[in-house]
């Protein structure tokens, strides 16, 4: 009887440990598959809001995009972008290494590498993608159950134009191209889970923070 009880006790412990292991795996898988997508027309405040989220949620990690443009003086390869030659970028397209990619401005290519998202998941963090509108729609379609998408928009196209001018990096044709693209992208806002109108940056940051906090608790 004592032997039988000991065997039963050992079996119960083993069963409990096995159940706990599978529950842990399930929880890890659910967290691993989560992905946050922040998108907006250029000049809407997307970068500032993304930085705020990363500063306030340690479980988030910025997904570094790949790009074929030349780095600016303050940018570092592997930190701000993965700077690739156009040949390397196209090789990765052919090898199906991108989660999404697009030719954005002036023939320059940008994209999200699958390996980058996997790197973040392997660290048991949630990737935050700061990407173009078309790419955001594509990624959301690949993760319909486990993604959170936030579309940031300016109060108006005129305000967006004013913000772009204040940067001092756009003028003439390039400015008009960005404004035209932004007006087009605004028509896609209904594709995303949440829309934040960035009239006041601090309020927009708080709204994004509340949305992300709820998503991470699911």
Regions of interest found by a model, annotated:
Residues 38:
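Hydrophobic anchor at the beta1->P-loop junction of P-loop NTPases
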Residues 41:
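P-loop (Walker A) phosphate-binding loop of NTP-binding proteins
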Residues 128-132, 143-165:
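Conserved phosphate-donor/acceptor-positioning beta-strand/loop module used by diverse small-molecule
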Residues 44:
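ATP-binding Walker
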Residues 47:
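Walker A/P-loop
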Residues 29, 162-170, 184-218:
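NTP-dependent small-molecule kinase module
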Residues 67-127, 134-137:
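ATP-dependent small-molecule kinase phosphotransfer cores
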């Amino acid at each position: 009887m004592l032997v039988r009880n000991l065997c039963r006790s050992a079996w119960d412990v083993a069963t409990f440990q096995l159940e706990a292991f599978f529950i842990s795996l399930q929880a890890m898988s659910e967290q691993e598959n989560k992905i946050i997508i922040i998108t907006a027309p250029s000049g809407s405040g997307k970068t500032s809001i993304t930085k705020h989220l990363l500063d306030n949620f340690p479980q988030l990690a910025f997904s570094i995009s790949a790009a074929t443009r030349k780095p600016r003086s303050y940018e570092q390869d592997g930190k701000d972008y993965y700077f690739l030659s156009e040949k390397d970028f196209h090789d990765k397209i052919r090898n199906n290494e991108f989660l999404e990619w697009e030719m954005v401005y002036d023939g320059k290519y940008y994209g999200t590498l699958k390996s980058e998202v996997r790197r973040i998941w392997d660290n048991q963090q949630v990737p935050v993608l700061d990407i173009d509108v078309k790419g955001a729609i594509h990624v959301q379609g690949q993760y319909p159950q486990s993604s959170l998408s936030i579309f940031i928009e300016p109060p108006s196209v005129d305000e967006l134009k004013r913000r772009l001018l204040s940067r001092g990096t756009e003028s003439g044709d390039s400015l008009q191209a960005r404004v035209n693209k932004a007006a087009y992208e605004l028509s896609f806002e209904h594709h995303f889970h949440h829309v934040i109108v960035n009239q006041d940056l601090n309020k927009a940051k708080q709204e994004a923070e509340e949305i992300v906090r709820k998503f991470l608790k699911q």
